[in-house]
Regions:
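Local cysteine-cluster metal-coordination motifs and their immediate loop/turn environment
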Residues: 36-46, 298-301, 345-363, 381
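Short Fe-S-cluster ligation motifs
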Residues: 65-90, 374-419
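Conserved, mostly hydrophobic/aromatic
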Residues: 37, 89, 294
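Radical SAM/AdoMet-radical enzyme domain recognition
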Residues: 67-90, 97-228
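Canonical Radical SAM [4Fe-4S] cluster-binding loop centered on the CxxxCxxC motif
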Residues: 23-61
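A C-terminal junction/extension of Radical SAM enzymes
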Residues: 231-307, 407-411, 416, 444
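C-terminal accessory region of radical SAM enzymes
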Residues: 243-271, 302-352
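N-terminal [4Fe-4S]-dependent radical SAM core
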Residues: 1-30, 75-81, 444
């Protein structure tokens, strides 16, 4: 039986590259072009914004370093691990520095052509924007110039009420009416529409109505959504998340939609075997980020823009190089030694539904002072998500037997605390009907 999958039209650059060049990888390179933003989103993890911006001189040094590292087949940048590049431009709001971004791309391509380098063709531009500068003629020209090479994600947090609850400007005014215009003008591959919805305490109660708006009114068929990792979630939030996701599931099925909503993905809620040691995060050299001053970071969230009072967790800079200084080497080595086991409490390792429970290594560092201590504020939200997934996929299975049924591995006491005894028994009955197993056999 098949599991729920992303729509086939939503294949990304990494997917295509893997098919064209088996065994080689695409590397994610981020340019933090500015710390400035024209919004003040209440849930934003970049809570130390300022006026800093990258100079063109620094940006050119970043580009030169990438080509130099590749030329010497360096451990972090080489033909196998960086056969292709995804060039991410981020802020702050990246389009505030659209002129710089254009200059960076011009220099990058001129160097690639000069060197007859594979990156002249094996690259993609990725940008996430709040959409407020969609009417700027410089932005429009850039998108036209790099059409087919640039992937733009305009963040829309659902309907106007949900979006404006958290995504406000410097005057505290909502931004939906300004952002939705660019969102409607920007489509993904094959004209498909996708966006990212960040679930936070301030907009949780509007989740279902927001998904309905995005899917039925705005034509979104791929919706990436997750709960913020930060502190602030309560058991009541977990109960509300289950209610909201159940409503989302009903809406999808009642309308016969093939919509992909990531938080309802099938692949969560089992137990990860003890032999699996992989860290959730790729911030150990798999990604690289250049901050505005040319400091090299394991990922953008290690920027002073985000981590605040913690020392910058750098692994190099454009002057001294990538992982050359002893302290940079030590930090990179420390990241690479992190495993699922080293950073997790025993209760997380023993959890029967720990598959799909996410964390952020950089937020670990921001909150605890070490990237090797896992922060678990989303624990109850993950439990609620898994319960909703069981509801969603077992009902889908009853409508279409090709859709895989889902065992409910959530312990009874955990489930009852979130959904209550009656709903728990209803979920078990649904599971029995979908899987054909008896209740005693399935009970954790």
């Amino acid at each position: 039986m098949r599991k729920a999958e992303k729509p086939k039209g939503a294949q990304n650059f990494m997917d295509m590259h893997a098919r064209l060049y088996p065994g080689s990888c695409v590397k994610d390179i981020t340019f933090i072009v500015t710390h400035r933003c024209n919004l003040r989103c209440t849930y934003c993890y970049e809570h130390h914004k300022g006026e800093e911006k990258m100079s063109l001189e620094t940006a050119k040094k970043c580009v030169d370093l990438l080509f130099a590292e590749d030329a010497k087949n360096a451990p972090l940048v080489n033909e196998q691990d960086a056969h292709g590049l995804i060039l991410n431009f981020i802020g702050g709001e990246p389009f505030l520095e659209i002129d710089l971004i254009r200059d960076i791309m011009a220099y990058f391509l001129s160097r690639a052509i000069e060197l007859k380098h594979r990156w002249a063709v094996n690259y993609m531009i990725s940008m996430s924007t709040n959409g407020l500068m969609g009417d700027d003629p410089r932005v429009r020209q850039f998108l036209k110039e790099f059409e087919g090479r640039v992937s733009i994600s305009v963040t829309i947090d659902g309907d106007k009420a949900a979006h404006d609850a958290c995504r406000v400007d410097c005057q505290g005014c909502g931004s939906y009416d300004r952002a939705i215009k660019m969102f409607r003008e920007v489509s993904g591959p094959d004209g498909r529409r996708q966006t990212k919805y960040t679930i936070a305490p301030g907009n949780l109660t509007l989740l279902a109505s927001s998904v309905r708006h995005l899917v039925l009114e705005e034509g979104v068929d791929t919706l990436h959504c997750n709960c913020v990792f930060e502190e602030g979630w309560t058991m009541e939030h977990a109960r509300e998340l289950y209610r909201q996701l159940k409503t989302v599931s009903d809406m999808i099925q009642e309308n016969g939609l093939d919509t992909y909503v990531s938080i309802l993905d099938w692949d969560a809620g089992d137990h990860v075997p003890d032999t699996e040691t992989q860290n959730w995060c790729g911030g150990d050299g798999k990604m690289l980020a250049f901050d505005v001053d040319g400091t090299i970071l394991p990922c953008l969230r290690y920027s002073s823009l985000s981590i605040g009072n913690q020392p910058v967790y750098r692994i190099g800079d454009v002057e001294s190089g990538l992982a050359v200084r002893p302290d940079d080497v030590a930090r990179l080595d420390a990241l690479r030694r992190i495993t699922r086991q080293s950073q997790s409490e025993q209760r997380c390792l023993d959890c029967p539904i720990n598959q799909g429970c996410a964390w952020c290594t950089a937020y670990n560092y921001e909150k605890t002072g070490t990237p090797d201590k896992r922060v678990t504020y989303i624990c109850d939200m993950h439990k609620a998500r898994v319960l909703a997934q069981c509801y969603h996929h077992n009902r889908l299975h009853l409508l279409d037997s090709a859709h895989a049924a889902k065992a409910m591995n959530v312990p009874q006491d955990w489930a009852v605390e979130i959904v209550g005894e009656a709903e728990y028994e209803a979920l078990r009955a649904l599971e029995r009907e979908a899987t054909g197993k008896n209740a005693v056999e399935m009970r954790p």
